[in-house]
Curated annotation (Swiss-Prot):
The gene is y11A. It holds the Pfam family DUF2685. InterPro entries: DUF2685. It comes from Enterobacteria phage T4 (Bacteriophage T4). It comes from the Viruses. This is Uncharacterized 6.1 kDa protein in uvsW-uvsY intergenic region.
Length: 55
């Protein structure tokens, strides 16, 4: 039984297939490609500061 859960599809990953990314463990193939293509998002703190400036 694997203790890693894919951050994309939320299913268990066989320990031999785990690909570690900066966002967490993913399956190789479509899940890994999806994570690689995600745009880099701003941190919550930056978003909060921008919202406060708008108000």
């Amino acid at each position: 039984m694997s203790d890693k859960i894919c951050v994309v599809c939320k299913t268990p990953i066989d320990s031999a297939l785990v690909v570690e990314t900066d966002k967490g463990p993913v399956h190789p193939g479509p899940c890994y490609n999806y994570i690689k293509e995600l745009p880099v998002s701003e941190s919550s703190e930056e978003q909060l500061n921008e919202t406060q400036l708008l108000l």
